């Protein structure tokens, strides 16, 4: 168990120089803040902060999910920074620390040249297929569909600006309302104080599951 207040203490942070090559770019812009509203079965807000071309990002989500008449409050922070990802439940002062899954995907797709190819391969790897184009918030978006989970994504420079999910009786829409390109305060990527983290090795879990299924 780890008590954390600063993610920079236990990861190898990417410098701007490291992220300057296309091989270290998730998104097509260097840094921005994107604000969203969440509607449907889940209602609330989400804010995405990122810099270093998406190699460092934080998502703050506050919402209420209603299923079959029962409601649950959601207050989550998801930080990706350097070697690690931190998924934090603010209300419970707890979370998990795992290896950064983006780095694993980049290694698997290292034959792709340029963020355009990498971004598309990332979407294809999760079962998304491009079905069209549409302007949204003044941006030219590509529309991708994941039929297996009933989701459509509106993607601009590999940033999802809008998503619609309709699956198993749940309808959840996440819609960007504002995009502010420019620098992001560093404290947005800092783990809140008094959070207890449980470190989880997802690779070990996957390997154990494979062994059990043999």
Language model regions located:
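Extended soluble regions of mature proteins
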Residues: 9-214
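Bacterial signal peptide processing site
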Residues: 4-7
């Amino acid at each position: 168990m780890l008590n954390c207040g600063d993610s920079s203490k236990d990861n190898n942070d990417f410098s701007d120089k490291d992220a300057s090559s296309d091989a270290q770019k998730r998104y097509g812009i260097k840094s921005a803040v994107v604000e969203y509203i969440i509607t449907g079965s889940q209602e609330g807000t989400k804010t995405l902060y990122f810099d270093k071309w998406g190699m460092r990002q934080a998502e703050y989500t506050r919402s209420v999910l209603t299923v079959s008449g029962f409601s649950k409050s959601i207050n989550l922070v998801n930080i990706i920074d350097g070697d690690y990802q931190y998924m934090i439940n603010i209300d419970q002062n707890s979370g998990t620390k795992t290896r950064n899954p983006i780095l694993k995907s980049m290694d698997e797709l290292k034959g792709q040249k340029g963020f355009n190819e990498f971004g598309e391969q990332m979407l294809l790897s999760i079962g998304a297929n491009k079905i069209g184009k549409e302007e949204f918030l003044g941006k030219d978006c590509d529309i991708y569909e994941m039929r297996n989970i009933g989701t459509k994504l509106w993607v601009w420079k590999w940033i999802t600006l809008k998503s619609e999910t309709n699956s198993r009786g749940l309808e959840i829409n996440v819609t960007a309302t504002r995009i502010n390109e420019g620098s992001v305060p560093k404290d947005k990527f800092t783990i809140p104080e008094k959070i207890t983290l449980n470190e989880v090795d997802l690779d070990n879990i996957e390997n154990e599951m494979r062994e059990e299924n043999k």
